[in-house]
Amino acid sequence: KALKPDLIIACYGINCGIYKPFDEERFNSYKDGLQRLKAKAEAKGAKIIFMTPPVYDKPNPKFNYDDVMKAYSEWLISKRKDSWKVIDLHSVMKKKLADKRTKNPNFKYSRDGIHPGTEGHELMSQQIINFFAVKPPLKDHQPNAYGRLLMFIRERMRVQRDAWLTEIGHKRPMKKGKTIAEANKIAANNTVRIQQNLETILKASN
């Protein structure tokens, strides 16, 4: 209600199975939750894009929790037939992980098997880029150009996230965010810097 987004990208699943073997009741709750989220988003005039959960890669001798994520992902992908917009992270990450491990058996996208690191997030973000049919420049012709770009993007995201979490009274343990007005001012300055860096990269790529 406070943000009034026009586009929502939602990724649920990795915590929804609560790290236990597949359970039909939990699975139905997951499906019901996403269907209700979609209905509420569209009722407010927002478009919604779902992403399948990323790979779970933490060994467990008792059962393979990633099989639960696979089931959740397959259901989400099946909803494309009902005109749901779905970006598949799970199968892409699983295939890439297997490919990487043919050369390095110890390769990981995530240190804890749950939260992807930089390379994992890069692969995930590329699937979003592919969904929107945006072709990024292939080479970084300017030293640290992408690094500077990412720095400004992260700062814009961080300050707005913390401001809104504080504004809506979220109970998440965190430092108090800035006011919305202060955050928007900082975000606007970062947007200018982001655009400047993008223009530099694009010019160098032509």
Mark where each language-model region is.
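Structural beta-sheet core signal
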Residues: 10, 50-51
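Proline-aspartate-enriched helix->loop->beta-strand connector
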Residues: 1-14
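A short helix->loop->beta-strand "cap" motif at the edges of active sites that frequently abuts
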Residues: 39-47, 84
